[in-house]
């Protein structure tokens, strides 16, 4: 039976021990041409009036998640060995982004919000500011100098690709990368910066573990995903030994309907009514997958510098991806906000599992740091393409019903601040300190 992927994250559908959610996440970004329209109007208008800063705290997790409000893992505080980079405020920034959709040609059409006709621009004039220290803007010249003769990979789903494109755009102000490889679907790519002999890549592996996926680029599936929770995806493990730096992340693919395999047998599933299988829940699979990933990293002979990026919140309102959800806000959140149950669950699993292996990684000579972008990203509902994942979506009718993307990020946009954090962490940790 052919079924559309659907996302229904109603908290009432969660149970405390086995989180049963009738949910399938948005399809991955389509492999579209990277060539941009040279007739695009200038991107950056006059900066808006300066509103007050927007705080990252308090974020109140749902009661059902049982998060410990006073529990702050020590590695979060020490991530840059100076301050907690992830507690802070979004403050007005009149300088705007470091690049435009005219100066960077690595922006996928789905994230090229201004080209696609997004009418507002205030979301471009904010930057992340940690409470206890300054966060310099990304320095592309210094970054490329540090990365001479190095290899770097972003490993994960389409959010990782969104992230690497932000980095490529920032670095393009110094040197244009040369694409030297892409897979058939344009999901995994490799670029080279010739003057620096720096290799940058993105490896598409939405589960990090082995998976059989029967889904087209529009998110239509012909069968349930078969997920092998005790076997890593060779697409990234076979390349791992050649990498000097890694940004790795899980994601919302774990919310999709899936059959779980362990020890050469089916162990259960997530949301598989009528299959006569044990409902284990997405949280079971996510924890098992992360444990396997982190065991591989901490036990590897390759002493890479590894950043584990935490889950990315979406901002769908009045529905989800396939049920009419929208994101039409034009400013960051202010005051208290609640994290969706699924985001809070995934985030807590990430914090717990990374904390368990941080000391072991250090003993083995591996730098493992947390890149906790979840809470700061939660405050930016204004940063998504929304209906402007498509070119001029309302050209034919102002009230047209169009697909909204409230998961990925506009480029330029809030995701660029993730790279400010990356730069600060690598400069203040390990051999670059």
Segment roles from a protein language model:
Residues 1-433:
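A compositional signature for long Ser/Thr(±Pro)-rich, low-complexity
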């Amino acid at each position: 039976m052919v079924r559309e992927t659907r996302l229904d994250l109603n908290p009432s559908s969660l149970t405390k021990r086995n989180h049963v959610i009738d949910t399938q996440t948005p399809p991955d970004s389509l492999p579209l041409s990277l060539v941009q329209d040279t007739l695009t109007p200038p991107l950056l208008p006059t900066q808006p009036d300066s509103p007050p800063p927007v705080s990252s705290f308090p974020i109140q997790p749902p009661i059902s998640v049982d998060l410990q409000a006073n529990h702050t893992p020590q590695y979060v505080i020490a991530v840059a060995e100076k301050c907690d980079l992830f507690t802070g405020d979004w403050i007005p920034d009149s300088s705007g982004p470091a690049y435009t959709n005219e100066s960077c040609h690595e922006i996928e059409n789905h994230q090229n919000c201004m080209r696609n006709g997004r009418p507002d621009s205030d979301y471009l004039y904010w930057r992340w500011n940690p409470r206890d220290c300054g966060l310099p803007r990304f320095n592309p010249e210094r970054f490329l100098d540090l990365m001479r003769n190095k290899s770097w990979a972003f490993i994960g789903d389409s959010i990782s690709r969104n992230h690497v494109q932000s980095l490529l755009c920032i670095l393009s102000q110094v040197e244009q990368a040369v694409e030297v490889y892409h897979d058939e679907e344009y999901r995994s790519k490799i670029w080279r910066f010739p003057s620096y002999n720096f290799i940058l890549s993105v490896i598409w592996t939405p589960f990090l573990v082995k998976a059989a996926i029967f889904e087209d680029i529009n998110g239509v599936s012909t069968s349930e995903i078969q997920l092998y929770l005790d076997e890593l995806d060779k697409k990234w493990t076979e390349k791992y030994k050649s990498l000097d730096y890694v940004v790795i992340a899980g994601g919302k693919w774990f919310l999709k309907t899936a059959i779980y395999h362990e020890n050469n047998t089916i162990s259960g599933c997530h949301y598989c009514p009528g299959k006569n299988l044990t409902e284990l829940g997405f949280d079971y699979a996510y924890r098992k997958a992360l444990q396997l990933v982190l065991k591989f990293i901490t036990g590897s002979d390759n002493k890479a510098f590894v950043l584990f990026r935490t889950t990315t919140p979406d901002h769908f309102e009045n529905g989800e991806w396939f049920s009419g959800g929208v994101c039409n806000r034009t400013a960051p959140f202010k005051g208290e906000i609640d994290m969706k149950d699924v985001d809070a669950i995934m985030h807590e699993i990430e914090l717990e599992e990374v904390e368990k292996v941080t000391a072991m990684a250090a003993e083995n000579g591996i730098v493992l740091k947390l890149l906790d972008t979840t809470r700061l990203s939660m405050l930016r509902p204004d940063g998504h393409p929304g209906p402007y994942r498509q070119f001029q979506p309302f050209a034919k009718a102002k009230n047209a019903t169009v697909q909204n993307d409230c998961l990925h990020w506009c480029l330029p946009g809030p995701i660029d601040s993730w790279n400010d954090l990356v730069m600060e962490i690598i400069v203040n940790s390990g051999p670059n300190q």
